[in-house]
């Protein structure tokens, strides 16, 4: 077989039919220098690398005024959606030191796409304050939110300090939790169907 010099198509993996398979991207957690999260996100965007910085708006009260402030939900961390080539490019930024890895391993920990979609949905549509819980929460009942701004979100119903919360688990990072009335959720089975 003769491969032309500039024909990169032949060097990519192929599926059964022979067409090129797209390079797979995955979500990783990059560790960032303290207070450099927003700047790093801007630089990654300029480089053309998809990234996600979880920011939540909060109202801060002083004696003479109130101000809406953006708060980084996970300090010193930014999510990047990269393939192997972009994974190396991200580390060229001086504000990024490394990727979060699994304990005892050297490969970066991958956050599943479904978890990221649920987490982003929760951040985008929640009216309530989202809290991150790193302490282990007992697995809760699988539920789907049926009312309110989070309608359609699937997660777990957990009880923390007597309050019902919907939790979205993130690999290696714990749970993102938000208060929700128990009447706004319905149980679902493992495959996503309604339970009787």
Residues covered by each model-derived region:
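Acidic-enriched and Gly/Ser
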Residues: 2-142, 157, 162, 167, ...
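Short, charged beta-turn/beta-strand-edge "cap" motif at the junction between a beta-strand
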Residues: 148-151, 172
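Short, Lys/Arg- and Gly-enriched loop/turn segments at beta-strand edges
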Residues: 151-157
């Amino acid at each position: 077989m003769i491969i032309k010099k500039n024909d990169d198509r032949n060097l990519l993996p192929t599926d059964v039919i022979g067409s090129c398979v797209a390079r797979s991207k995955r979500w990783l957690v990059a560790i960032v220098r303290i207070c450099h999260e927003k700047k790093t996100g801007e630089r990654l965007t300029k480089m053309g690398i998809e990234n996600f910085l979880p920011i939540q708006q909060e109202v801060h009260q002083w004696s003479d005024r109130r101000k809406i402030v953006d708060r980084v939900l996970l300090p010193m961390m930014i999510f990047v959606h990269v393939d192997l080539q972009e994974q190396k490019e991200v580390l060229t930024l001086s504000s990024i030191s490394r990727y979060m890895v699994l304990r005892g391993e050297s490969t970066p920990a991958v956050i599943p796409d479904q978890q990221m979609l649920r987490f982003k949905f929760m951040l985008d549509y929640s009216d309530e304050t989202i809290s991150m819980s790193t302490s282990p929460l007992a697995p809760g009942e699988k539920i789907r939110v049926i009312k309110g701004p989070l309608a359609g979100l699937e997660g777990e119903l957990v009880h923390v300090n007597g309050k019902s919360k919907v939790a979205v688990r993130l690999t290696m990072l714990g749970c993102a939790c938000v208060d929700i009335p128990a009447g706004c959720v319905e149980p679902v089975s493992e495959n996503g169907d309604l339970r009787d």
